[in-house]
From Swiss-Prot:
Belongs to the AXUD1 family. Residues 364-373 have a biased composition (Pro residues). It is found in: Nucleus. Residues 1-79, 306-381 are annotated as: Disordered. Widely expressed with highest levels in thymus and lung. Low levels detected in naive T-cells. Residues 18-41, 335-361 have a biased composition (Low complexity). GO terms for cellular component: nucleus. It comes from the Eukaryota. Its main location: nucleus. This is Cysteine/serine-rich nuclear protein 1.
Amino acid sequence: MTGLLKRKFDQLEEDDSSSSSSSSFSSRLSLSSFPASSASPAWNSDEEGPGGQAPQSDQDSCGLQSFTPPSILKRAPRERPGHVAFNGITVYYFPRCQGFTSVPSRGGCTLGMASRHSTCRLFSLAEFTQEQVRARREKLRRRLKEEKLEMLRWKFSVAGVPESGAGVPLTADAIDDASVEEDLAVAVANGRLEEANFLQPHPPRQRRALLRASGVRRIDREEKRELQVLRQSREDCGCHCDGVCDPETCSCSLAGIKCQMDHTSFPCGCCREGCENPNGRVEFNQTRVQTHFIHTLTRLQMEQGAESLGDLESPVEDTPVEQAALSPFPPSKPPVSSELGDSSCSSDMTDSSTTLSSGSSEPPNHPAHPSLPGPSFRSGVDEDSLEQILNFSDSDLGIEEEEEEGGGVGNLDNLSCFHLADIFGTGDPGSLASWTHSQSGSSLASGILDENANLDASCFLNSGLGGLREGSLPGSSGSPEGDAVQSSSWDLSLSSCDSFELLQALPDYSLGPHYTSRRVSGSPDSLETFHPLPSFSPPRDASTCFLESLVGLSEPVTEVLAPLLESQFEDAALAPLLEPVPV
């Protein structure tokens, strides 16, 4: 049914040719789809095809589908005119006349304008703006003159001198223009020029002067009496009943309006119990108004609170990884949750602080990882990427793999003994000690330590050599001075020193023939006396080491170890960085 109606509307919109073709097509369609009956044998003979069969209805349906009349809903969009552009402003000027339309608060002779304009002017936008500024300045100048004139009159009245005895007429023309211009400049600077844009009421004398200046010769005095009656009628509201309203004498009842009470005895003097006005009574409900005010104020405060809460939740806080990437310098004490992400294999912009207690020693059968950090201690850094960085092979270092006889030294690629919690400590005092125990008691006699770990040699001196030998490295022989400083902590922080010192201190690693650590036969867990560390210096502040690493300075070497350094580093330069130690 909808399709038929749509075609009907389409036929109304089409021209004569299209409507005729559509009508012929619809008539032909009706003839072909007319049902065959026994009463019309001629039609049956005409409709039969060459094979004696009637035409199929599919042909008609195909013809109907192929016909797509244009829709009345899809019309070509009309070309809309461009945006409105103002190229000029026409100003019409009307002469003043006595209005009879407004009710001023005092006096008569209201101001109005004529029904037809007298002149008109055409301004451009810039000219009209300048004209407005000029008109406002002129209004402000006249107002300043009037203020000066009123001040002068007040001075004469205070002094007791009559205006006639002043010698000059007290008019606006008597005011000095130079003083007015000075006051005008100050007023414009203070922003009083915008005040001239608002309409200001004129006193009765000024209204009469404006009318006479506009050419009004006769001012109707009757308007003054009419305005006085209107003002009195507006002031006289409500009934004058005293407590009790008599419907026969109450002015509100006689006027057919309700009595009204805003506050006690105003405007109507009747009370609630004594009001007999048949039209009713209206009272001002202060409680209702106050309740409405409180509800409105509460609703506004709730809306403002919701908006402020939405503004606070909109900014997304940076993740620890983004904060570490944005910060140009590493924090002195990174949070526990970001210690895993702040440590790196070869990085000059990371800092890891690990506080270790040198007075604890554990048996070899102690678990290798006594305290593993939980999920809350993991940083946002992907552990797979960290493990890929840590699990470097000999081909990455450029060192050919050498197999030792007897299988004492395992494959350098086998770094299964490393754990992320051991390298990037979580602040556990026994983490490094447990790591050294697990390495000394494991089947793999030599684990691989990251050669690029930025470790400062001065951190060992902060806790003493004895604290390092006894607390950090189990089984090592210590000195009496180390017992006094076992409780101190040492910091693995940034420094200009490389990792030769820590590699020399650890038992399972060697940096060359001059740096090999010999074990005492019969006690594999105990170490002989250490060779003197080349870069040991008096303990200094970690910030000093960090600044030296930025400017590229190296840590000064003590004069006592200077001869040893020269001989050792000449041979150590030719030795590989990492050399397995046969057990």
